[in-house]
């Protein structure tokens, strides 16, 4: 019994949604789409938190992907194996991940945090902790990362050899095809987005909504993304200023 599980942030490119649907149909695999129960999408989440996520505060991943996935697993009444297409070379943090693990392993780990100047020990993960521990008494959620040591080219080669096609955004120069755009996107990708009406308008509209619907507003891009001299306020850039840069 195989299911493809997609955590929809509501911030993907239309071609990504189509690609996911096409692949599942071609492989005759059931597609399960998960969404946050708390937020409508990425922009709604950002507005309700009065800021966009950043490299230092990536709450988008936990709120729009991790929590919906946890909710889904807890709805299952049988053990499962979660296959993740994560590669070690994608980032330093991902390189630290094991090849295989227990999906809920972090619920049994303690970490130290600084809270108001005091170091305290807390559980590494505590979302629905009681529900998770109860579920784990009866079932198991194992994680396997079969392409963990592969190169990007090996992944593409494998997709092509299976008669499939990669996400079309890769052929257009994008290195990230999750959120469109990701808060971690490179300047070259921003340049590509600025040349496409859909992407350009989406970013401008999101930032405008943030300005209109929150007390202080917030820029999509963090301070320092471009040199301060190109920012009207000399601190952080607007989307339009980044496009012009």
Language-model features: where?
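Nucleotide-activated chemistry modules centered on ATP-dependent adenylation/adenylyltransferase
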Residues: 1-245
